[in-house]
Amino acid sequence: ILWETSGHLDHYSENMYPPINHDENNETYYLKPMNCPFHILVYKSDLHSYKELPLRYFEFGSVYRYEKTGVLHGLLRLRGFTQDDAHIFCSTDQINDEVKTLLSFSVKLLGSYGLTEIEADLSTKPNKYIGSDNDWDNATNSLKQSLTELKVPFQTAEGEGAFYGPKIDLHAKDAIGRRWQLSTIQIDFAQPDNFDIEYVNSDNKKSRPVMIHRALLGSVERFTAVLLEHYAGNLPGWLSPIQIDVLTIGNVNDYAQTIIDDLKSYRVNLDDRNIRLGEKLHNSEKSKTPIQIIIGEKDASSNTMAVNIFGKENMKDVDYKKAINSIKKLSLIHISEPTRQIVI
C-alpha cells in the first residue's frame, strides 16, 4: 500500500480518514492526506541523470485530513483543502541554491498580495531523526543562510523539526498585527529512502536525491481567509472577484452595454433588475465590490455617470470618458499601494 511505503499509516494515521473497502474488487482505498507520494511515483516512472536535477513537480492538489471537530475553523482549518504543492528532487550540493530560490519566491509572492511583514521559524534536528548528522547540518545551514541573505527575520525552534528533515515556516502579519503561518519549505531525507528513488551521478553510479517539499500559499483556502482578514473583506481592485458593478435605473441597457464594452478587460457585473437602487447598492456593498457605476436615463442622454469608489467620496455627473479612463487606472493599481486612489 502506498501509504505504508510512505510511512503515513505508521506516523500520520490519526490524521487520515479510515480506509474505504471496496468489496467488489477486494481493494482498500484511502483519501490522500498529502500529495508527495504521487510526485515520487512520477519521479520513479523514469530513469534520471544528474543533468536533469533539480527536477521540480508542481500541482494544485486536493488533500483530506481528519481534523478534530474542535480545531476546525472556517476556511482557516478544514478537513479538505487544496495545496499549491511542489516537490523538488535535487542533489545535496544543490540544496542551498534551491532553498534560496524558494524562499525568495515565497517572500515575493506574499508581498505581491500585500503581506509584507514576514517572519520565519527555523525548525531544527529533533532527538529522533533519520539521515546523517552531516546531512542535517548542511541542510539546516542552507536554510539559515538563505534566511540571513534574504534578510528574513527568524527564530530557531531547536529540536522541533520533523524526524525526516529541517524546515522553514513563514509567518505573515496582517493589518492589525496578527501572525499567520503560510509558506513551508521542508527538506526530506526519509521519502527518497522509503521509495528507493535514485539518479545516475556524474561517475555513472546511482545516488540518492534529496527531496524538498514546498507550499507557498499553505493552502488556497487558508490563504484566501488570511487575505480576507488582512483587508477586512475589501480586497484590492485587481484581486476582487467582481471589480465593477454597473447599476441601472430605468431602461438604459444600451448605455450600460457601451460602458461594459469599454471595460471588457475587467470583471464587470451588470445589475439591471427591476428593483430599487438602494437594494442594488446594498447588494454590491455587501459583496465588497470596490467600484459601482450608477446610470439612469439622464446619464444616458448627457453621456455621464455616477461613480462610487471604496474609500472615496461618491461622485455624480462625471464625464463618461474621464470616468472610464480613471477607472482603468484604478484597476491597475498594485496591491502594495496603501489605498485605492482615483482622480476624476
Regions found by a protein language model. Give the residues of each.
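NTP/phosphate- and nucleic-acid-binding module
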Residues: 1-332, 336, 340
